[in-house]
Amino acid sequence: MEEIKEKLRAFIQERFEIDDDPDFTDDVHLFNEGFVDSFGAVEIIHFIEQTYNIEITQKDITLYPMNTIEEIAEVVENKLS
């Protein structure tokens, strides 16, 4: 799962221009802390689907919290297994 988190972290940092912010960690709430907005969430899901050739459904979004890099990586890992 560490590789998934690294890819997510790198994508989010590059796409949303997050420099070496000490508050940007794997367990920070990306939305509440203002790192990502709702449009950004769509971009993250698109990145995941393209990178891992999986589909993130509306059901996934409803059932599983995906507010942190840790939570998103868990969903991806579960979809891959």
Question: Where are the predicted features?
Answer:
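Residue-level signal for the nucleotide or nucleotide-sugar donor/cofactor binding architecture
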Residues: 67
